[in-house]
Amino acid sequence: MAKVSKRLKVLRSSVEANKLYAIDEAIALVKKAATAKFDESVDVSFNLGVDSRKSDQVIRGSVVLPKGTGKTTRVAVFTQGVNAEAAKEAGADVVGFEDLAAEIKAGNLNFDVVIASPDAMRIVGQLGTILGPRGLMPNPKIGTVTPNVAEAVKNAKAGQVQYRTDKAGIVHATIGRASFAEADLKENFDALLDAIVKAKPAAAKGQYLKKVAVSSTMGLGVRVDTSSVNN
């Protein structure tokens, strides 16, 4: 316990409370503070000026990070026929139809992303109570229900991340690992920010990008000066 306290004390000393840092400096501080014995993820949160209680202000989508996520993504695809072969060639880990649904009902969910062709949704829809709570339910808004399953598989494997506002209007997402170069994390950050800015609801009023923070799995959060990001 003493080691944890000492580590946290060192981390806190490197970040000034209530100070807003330029995004480049924030990323550098987070990398420096990521001293755990594993490769910590680097995460970002965007506090947006939206009312998530209103359906027309819920932001949801996906974006392929140019430098990837630093993790291996296992992809399952519900499809059949030529689409099944295309999905396999694109790198899907599991491809099936009724047989895949049976495996999932049996508790076999060894994958991170589920993709489905439109014709498969009659089967996938029956798995809502299993896939939904795990955030695995395919959705056309994030590109996981699509006739072009091969492209969706390639995107997932290339480092696609999904984002969605929570009840407080905050988007949480991972932009890489602490082992990434600062420039690579910044490039991923910019790609995610660009997607979120483009997704701004027409009904959203006032300041859209209210607060931004960057953190690592075991480190402290660093608040970002929103004027330092290109929005």
Swiss-Prot record:
One of its GO terms (cellular component) is cytosolic large ribosomal subunit. The keyword tRNA-binding applies. Keywords: Repressor, Ribonucleoprotein, Ribosomal protein, RNA-binding, rRNA-binding, Translation regulation, tRNA-binding. PROSITE patterns: RIBOSOMAL_L1 (PS01199). Coiled coil: none annotated. Signal peptide: none annotated. SUPFAM superfamilies: Ribosomal protein L1. GO terms for biological process: regulation of translation; translation. InterPro entries: Ribosom_uL1_bac-type, Ribosomal_uL1, Ribosomal_uL1-like, Ribosomal_uL1/biogenesis, Ribosomal_uL1_3-a/b-sand, Ribosomal_uL1_CS. Part of the 50S ribosomal subunit. Binds directly to 23S rRNA. The L1 stalk is quite mobile in the ribosome, and is involved in E site tRNA release. Protein L1 is also a translational repressor protein, it controls the translation of the L11 operon by binding to its mRNA. Belongs to the universal ribosomal protein uL1 family. This is Large ribosomal subunit protein uL1. It comes from Neisseria gonorrhoeae (strain ATCC 700825 / FA 1090). The gene is rplA.
